[in-house]
C-alpha cells in the first residue's frame, strides 16, 4: 500500500450503504488478452498463460514488459474445493489510491490444475477524486458451510500514508459478496464509516487512515454466533498501529476485538490473524526483519471479550524465530492439521511466509508444530522455536498468502519478478505438500487419509 509519491485529493462525505443486488455473470467481464485497451495509452494487457500442469507453479496474473502490472495476491477455498485467486490489476501503474486499479479473479475447480480466464471483480472508473476511482488490496474468505464469499478492499482515490488522507478524507473500505462460490459478485458497497467509527473514541485518537491486511481473512473453527462462524481481520492503521476486528454476520458488520484504547502492535504494519487451537487469536504483523506477534486471550468467546498481551514480540529477537533478512514485507500465517511422521501424532502445524531475503527476495515458509498448549500460551512462546524455512522462490519476490486445498496441499500464492528483474511482480500460484514444506516431517491429514484408502 505504502508509497512515496505525493498527491492531493478532494474531501467527500460518507456514503450510505444500501442493499446490493447480485451482478449477473457478464461475459463482457472476460479479460481481453493480447489486445490494446483504448483506455490504456501506454500499457497493454498481459497475454493469457496456459495452465495445464497440475503439480507445478503457474503464473495466474503475469506481468511482462510494458504491460499493465499486477500485484497483491489474495486466495480462498470454498467448501466444495473451488479456489478463488484475486489480484490487483493496475492501469495507473501504482498502488491503490494513485489512480485506476481493478480487482481481477480466476477460479479453479480441480485443486489448481486448471484455471478459468480472468474475470473482473471490481473495476475502478479512474476518475480523480472519485470514490470508485480504484479497488485494490483485497482480503478474502469463503464461508466454511455455505456458498458465500466476501472480499474486503480499499476503494477510492486516497493514499494510505499521505498527510491528505485523514479521518475527514479517509482511505475508504468496500465489501463485495458472492452467494455462489465466487462465480458472480455483488457491486462493491462502501462500509468506511462503520469501520472508522469503531475507533473514534479511542484514547489513541481517531484513526486517520486504515485498510484491511490483504490476502486471507480468518474464519473461526470454533466460534459460531447465529448463522456464521466468526471472521477475524487485522487492520493497518495510523496513528497507533494495528487493530483487529471481528464479524459474526460474515462481513456485514464489524466490531473491535479487545479494547479500542490500545493497539496489539503499535509499530506493526500490514497484519494478518489466525485462530489458535484453544480459540484465542494470534496477530502476525509485518515488521522489518521478521514479524510482530501478539495473542488475544478470550474471557468469553460468545461475547467477544478478552485482552491482548501488553507487548507485541518481534520474531527475530526470539530463539529460532521467524526472520526476514533486510526486508519488511506482507506475509501469511496459517494453521493446518497435520500428522508427525516420526510419531504418528496428530497436531496443529503453523505456517508463516516471508521473503527470506536479503531484501524482497527468496520468499519462503517457516513452520512450527503446536505440540502442546504451552507452545502458544503467550506471544513469546508462539514466537519461539520455529523450523525451516522452506524456500519457495529463488527470485526477487514479496507478498504472499496461502490456504489449504481440498487435496491437503497448500495453495501458495505469491509475488515474484518471474519474467525479468525490474519488471513488476507476477502473481504466482504454487501447490505445496506439507512434506515439501517440512522436509518430510509432517503430512496433511487430508492427504494421509487419501493415501490410506
Residue ranges and their predicted role:
Residues 1-21:
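Bacterial Sec-dependent N-terminal signal peptides
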Residues 21-453:
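Asp-box/BNR beta-propeller blade signature and adjacent active/binding-site loops
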